[in-house]
Amino acid sequence: EFRRVLFRSVAGTVGLMMAKILKVSSKNSLKAAIDLGIAMQLTNIARDVIEDGKRNRSYINSNFESIIKTLKLADSFYESSFKSIKEIPLNSRFGILVARRVYREIGNKILNKKNMDNYKNSGKIYVSNFGKINQTLLSVFDLIKLVFTKQSEHLRKDEHSIINEQINLNERI
């Protein structure tokens, strides 16, 4: 429980700081920023298992099942961040959608490796320039989809009750 709260607080704080920089004030959007920060950090952890192992760092077990589990968790955080992106100021919204898609695509590329041997032999996994262009174009559809998406209660509200005890969403930075 402590590790979970610590991880979510640290990873979520990165998203929260970005939200404050972008002048996001909606509580739902701040929660989405926390979720997006967590999703991106989980993706980094899954991507860097081999590199971290060489440096005697271990955030998850170094087997493909743990990587899959981590990426599925990341995916749930990417999903929960989407609807509240609608409340982010328009001038920042598209960039956030692109970053969300590009990072999520890193996870998809990892999953496409299918097993640990392929993962180990692939080197650093990243999204190519063409892939980034593709994800940018797909983000246009996300932007349009947001116009027709109704704002609803945040998907991970129960988990945020733990985070809310640690982070004051009304605090000024």
Describe the residue ranges of each PLM region.
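Catalytic cores of Mg2+-dependent Asp-rich isoprenoid enzymes
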Residues: 3-40, 46, 50-173
